[in-house]
Amino acid sequence: MPRRGRVPRRAVLADPLYGNTKVTKLINQVMLDGKKSLAQRICYDAFEIIKNKTGKDPVEVFEQALKNVMPVLEVKARRVGGANYQVPVEVRPERRQTLGIRWLVNYARARSGKSMQEKLAAELIDAANNTGGAVKKREDTHKMAEANKAFAHYRW
């Protein structure tokens, strides 16, 4: 146990174009090798594509996509008497958002062909419509938690 107090979380600054902290977190997740300006360009171009394809506000589409992807439950491995159990636990709000953004970006990267802007835009639109890889990942996570409900009493 650390003897010092808890380390405070750094506040995430709102992004310059939309003034939204969730968009900043998306940009940071897209960023590779510290190339933030490139990540910003990718995200903003993806938002332009979303605006052109759907005719809706891209930030609203992103927030809806994030809401559809954020998991409520997940499983954690817990060792009890020589056996490993997958114990379902609730996901804290901060982690919920982080996982949602991470899954959106990872499944956008995994899409074939095209530029990252188009892949990210397509994944966000799909997630907003409750389809796509990231939504499937959330469903699988919930299914795992449901299947292991019997071990819920091992929670800590």
From Swiss-Prot:
InterPro entries assigned: Ribosomal_uS7 (IPR000235), Ribosomal_uS7_bac/org-type (IPR005717), Ribosomal_uS7_dom (IPR023798), Ribosomal_uS7_dom_sf (IPR036823)
The keyword Ribonucleoprotein is annotated on this UniProt entry: yes
Disulfide feature: none
Matches recorded under Pfam families: Ribosomal_S7
GO cellular component: small ribosomal subunit
Membrane spanning stretches: none
One GO term of the biological process aspect: translation
Role summary: One of the primary rRNA binding proteins, it binds directly to 16S rRNA where it nucleates assembly of the head domain of the 30S subunit. Is located at the subunit interface close to the decoding center, probably blocks exit of the E-site tRNA.
Entry similarity comment: Belongs to the universal ribosomal protein uS7 family.
Name of protein: Small ribosomal subunit protein uS7
Lineage of producing organism: Bacteria, Bacillati, Bacillota, Clostridia, Moorellales
